[in-house]
Amino acid sequence: ADGMPYAEVFQYLSSPQPNFGQLVNNYIAHYQRQSYPYATIGVINTQYIQSMAQLMKQVNATYTWNTANNHQLQDLDGDHFVPTVYFDFGSYARTLFGSNLALYSQYQTLMAQLVPYKGNTAYIYNASGTTTRVNEFSGIAISAPSANTGQYGYNVALLKMQTAWWADSH
């Protein structure tokens, strides 16, 4: 992979008023021209992280995720981790909130502030050497729904509970 194509995007980062939308557009366009056309990018406005954690704390006090529903989520691992470790945060929220449209609307408004710019190619490349279709991409991956208990020596189902995000959102 090429990483960040600075020759094509640096001008959008280095100006006094960065143009993150154009950065995302050029980043994705760069990868779409490659022989390996796989990429995702999310620009995160960190001043909204605590607000999102507070909203998710309210949600997690009311709703409990059933890992049997993980198949409904956008997998961002492909075949690398089994069971999946990383899912799309937006996919998770949409499924978790279910029919609570008021809460989901609040989430969407906050998410638009937290991730004002995002982009993805039609597929992503996985560490296992396979590709995964991207049907939904919010700009953030999340491991909260993961039931992975030990692949590669990491018990994600337990380790995720030791993160600052988990403490702030549960």
Regions found by a protein language model. Give the residues of each.
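Terminal, contiguous helix-loop blocks that mediate binding/assembly
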Residues: 1-170
